Amino acid sequence: MVRQGIDRRYLSSIILLQESAKTAQKAQDMKQLVFERINSGGVKLEPQETRNALYNGPMNELCANLARNKYLCALFRIPNEESYSLLDDEQELPDVAERVEKELENNSLYRTMYDVELVLRFFAIRNLEGYQNQFSDFLDKYLIYANKFSSETLKKLSSLFSDTIFFAYQLLGENAFFLWRYRRTKSGSKWGWFTRSTTTVYDPLMFVLSEFLDQKECLLSTVKAIREDLKPFYQKNYDVFEGRNSNRSDIEKRITLYREFFKKYLED
């Protein structure tokens, strides 16, 4: 069943067919056919909207629930009652719930279920060896596979995501997934922060931070130095981070660079 309690684009809801298929495979084939026809005309569904209806299951539901994590929402500027207090200490409006509801309607990450995909990406990249062709296909296959995980495994993965996104917020602040980039403009060229979170940073950084959870306190004790060193880190390795390339090789290179970057603070 499509994620309950969440009013996303109406196409994600009308796919709830009263199927008469005799087998699970037949039901899946029918869903796939419906989506192919819908996507060939009218409003085209985004990848995660399609996954949400075609491949719903325990892992998909977990991703949907974790997408409302207050730290993820704060870092990607997705409206959330709890995350408002992280971004604005003065946010104590009595109508905050109503405000969040209205803002969610206009938030593209939420409306297209990209927030749910962000969580799925975190889990899938832990199995990067399965990424062979298109990234979207990789996510599809991982979700199908992960929907079969035991409840105990899902519980552990849930804690891993929650602990890692909190660590990212603690260590690098609300702009943890911003990229320090080089820009050429008519008035000249300069370095500056790309002022929104990007998966170019999110994907490899979250992977590496999850590896360092056991050394979390040591890294947090050097938070000032780490934040100051990020700019020269990105400048030195900009050829690896520029652009939107996200093939397996790109992600692996970024993971290696982040891993080496954080290791030096544990060796001092």
Label each region the model flagged:
Residues 1-130, 140, 235, 239-246:
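Basic- and aromatic-enriched surface patches that contact anionic nucleotides/nucleic acids
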Residues 112-268:
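C-terminal subdomains that position terminal phosphate/3'-OH groups for nucleotidyl transfer/ligation
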